[in-house]
Amino acid sequence: MNFHIGNEVWWEDPDNNGLRSGAYEVVDIDRDNDVLTLSNGSSIVEAFSDECVFPSEYLYNS
């Protein structure tokens, strides 16, 4: 996947029938360690791998 600072990652709320509950911006991209940091402080690892799988609660929105 191709990420840029400012891309949005939506949060899906499993307690609300999976509806989108908000979005977090990508605030840091660490390509050397293959990690994205979101504005809520969470990290997504292996973000640039072909096998990248977002945690089930997140949906990528380019």
Model-found features: residue ranges?
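Short coil-to-beta transition motif at edge beta-strands of beta-rich domains
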Residues: 1-15
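Basic/aromatic-rich interaction segments and small domains that mediate binding to polyanionic partners
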Residues: 12-48
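Intrinsically disordered, low-complexity, charged/polar segments
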Residues: 40-62
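A generic structural signal for solvent-exposed, polar alpha-helical segments
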Residues: 9, 16-17, 30, 54, ...
